[in-house]
Amino acid sequence: MRKLLIYLRDYKKECVLAPLFKLLEASFELIVPLVMAAIIDKGIAVSDRPYIFRMGGVLVLLALIGLTCSITAQFFAAKAAVGFSTKLRYALFSHIESLSFSEMDTIGTSTLITRMTSDINQVQSGVNMVLRLFLRSPFIVFGAMVMAFTVNVKAALVFVVTIPLLSVVVFSVMAASIPLFKKVQNGLDQVLGHTRENLEGARVIRAFNKEEQEQKEFYESNGFLTNMQMIVGRISTLMNPLTYIIINCAILAVIWIGGKQVYGGIITQGEVVALVNYMSQILVELVKLANLIVNINKSIACGNRIQEVFEIQSSIESGSKEADAAVEKDAPAVEFSHVSMSYAGSAEESLTDIDFTVKKGQTIGIIGGTGSGKSSVVNLIPRFYDVSKGCVRVDGRDVKDYDLVTLRDKIGVVMQKAVLFQGTIEENLRWGNPDATEEELWKAIEVAQATDVVEGKEGKLSYMVEQGGRNLSGGQKQRLTIARAVVKDPDILILDDSASALDFATDAKLRSALRNLQGNKTIFIVSQRTSSIQFADQIIVMDDGQAVGIGTHEQLLENCEIYREIYESQFKKEDLQKQKGGAF
């Protein structure tokens, strides 16, 4: 948590002025009981109305000055707290963006969202409260006790006994509740994760009639969060009754001692009222101080969770730009040299001894069953993950030697899940190349077989895509993501099962258009359809993380049993579909 305070360094002035103005407010507040005592003893007791009005004016003046100081302090505290959280949120977002896929998979999306939102909001609240109360509350507690001694020493001894008792109660409650705060936040992570998963998979859940099962699982995770919050709440609710019992007993003691001394002529009625007011001030400020300490500990727990993310360093370090300039022009476009790879947290290898070479301009097909390692292979080329053994080279250089920006500028990737962002179609396509002309955009749209999609929308390129592309079908999203990658005009184009939602005729037209792209482009097509890859220069057959066959379509039909089984299981069905679609 302490390391996060560097984001307050631009607000040093506010961090000084906020508590300073709160101290000024507290100072004027400590004077109020003495003024009240004077009004009672010197005004009301002798019916001196002018004196009462004068001192009443002093009270109003003290209230106005205190109000001004309070508003000013709140302004500076809010400015510092909001500025702090803004800088912290940006720094955390930037750090998350720098993490590799491996770290992102380990942490989890819902956890990161919680830490970006709920945790940072809690830390912001903690900073605000600290700046306003960390000096004010202790100052009033001790100031009120000192002022009580100036009024009457014997009655003030009650304060000496009361304050330690109150402190024991406050800190006992705090010590019991603090360890539970982290469990509450972890429970919130679970609830948010479950909610996110259900919202994203709502159609699947309903298709399989799993609403009741998901509701039961949500009830369990929500129940855990509720139980933790109830336990914390029960412990926290002990504070007010216990503190009020102690303070009311103390007030009774002050009144009893003060009453005896009033009858003895030692102190006045106004001074007894002042002592009671000081005791009330102590009560209020100790409760505030307790809430502050609880809030601080919540903020520390949340701050530590945020710091945990900052301490996670990306396992992928960018290479030097000097290495980029040393690219071998005649080298293979992509080379896998005995590559093995494991995902974080997995003891088993996801890829084992993958070895192949791809020349520039070649089209490579990758096929295999679900979970065979197809996507894992292509994810190593733009270095989304790192190899555990072997080496991946692009243009003759190890991908680890490349500057990441330079490496990924060479590569266009279309993921399995078509992701579009809120904005116009044009804005989404320009992710590939911000400087692309409109002609280049339409050319990419044509290659991706998305011309009818764009022209059919109101506004065409200006058509507004909703968040996540909710207002587009699966096939439309896939074609637009392919167009976005084509706009980039990369040296290497990777299509990771990105035509799965397209019919056979459209898929065939897409492959034909890709073959006719300008430039010596190297294309990787990951697919479960043999028809999508059978005309590739090389086909890599994946099974259980291993390349069990590499060759052309004809060679693999003769030499690779797995490929032959895949082909024979599909070709009759595909022939029927192609006849219906008129694809070939």
Report residues per predicted region.
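Transmembrane helices of ABC transporter permease
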Residues: 10, 14-27, 62, 128-184, ...
